[in-house]
């Protein structure tokens, strides 16, 4: 029976716990589509006490009957992707459902070298890139000089497509950044080898999705990073090079907006950010250390410590608006268990005035001071709670406050990394467009 096509997006700066929520929802999905980003994003899934860290491959790969498609809007590092496939095989996970869009762009060795060299040259003006070559790959895509997955399947086409860009990048690496040039033949042979291994998984992205839609399959679109890292709608220039927002699903997967039935946002019960850029609710000292330790706040991709802060309702409301969120999944509520009081940012002060919107200027955003409301903590463990009735009253009050502040119902509450540490308030795919936990 046809149920729904759903987009899952991050409602903050990424690292919200989308991997767990997507894993949960993938049980009801026939097709899971990753629609943007590359190996600069990571998600962690815990299965039978095994911790699996993925960067490119969708969480749905854990379900043998689910098709997992890496869409046209992604940028693919084939070496990393094949490493993930080998890791999954070693863990006895069936990878036959994996599909890779023929039109996805490929991260080449010079993209990584340029990314790292440019970030180093920026010095104090660095933007916090992961150094994985994502920005340069997307730049080549925009300049129509990129290499696509389909090019790896034909030696002559790869040679023809690579000749000009590689010569240009070698000159740039040598002349501007003092980096040794790449050998063309070595690169060609390496990437032809990747192409041979990936060939059985390569498909036409749009055709695959629309066939699934015609067959009335349930399709789950999985975004990477988060709303505030969106190239057009985030805290520019401290953003990624793609569009993690819900609208990016249509572009990156090759579907029209009428195919999307529901948009689910994922947000932590507090806020984190990796890398540079303004962060109004950022904490320091012992509180920051406590959230970092209890939340395990280190990046899946880079290992960098995440910056921690109180929940920011201003960016939360903005995420609801930009993405058209129908409901919200709140993760890591358990991280707040030991606090005697919890603060929530409800507005900003900018130049002496109260504002309740997200400013478009990064300079203005850096000057914003948070206006907080303080709520009581619950100072007891929520990790074993499996229903709303199990939650302590202050925790319920906190969730209701967030739902009211963001003007969106909460459908899922996560209380730990394991699949069973989850409260489903209403089924966000099968149920009506509402949730029980709302103001």
Swiss-Prot record:
GO terms for molecular function: adenylosuccinate synthase activity; GTP binding; magnesium ion binding. IMP binds at residues 15-18, 40-43, 130, 144, 225, 240, 304. Its main location: cytoplasm. It is an enzyme of class 6 (ligase). One of its GO terms (biological process) is IMP metabolic process. SUPFAM superfamilies: P-loop containing nucleoside triphosphate hydrolases (SSF52540). Belongs to the adenylosuccinate synthetase family. Plays an important role in the de novo pathway of purine nucleotide biosynthesis. Catalyzes the first committed step in the biosynthesis of AMP from IMP. This is Adenylosuccinate synthetase. It comes from Synechococcus sp. (strain CC9605).
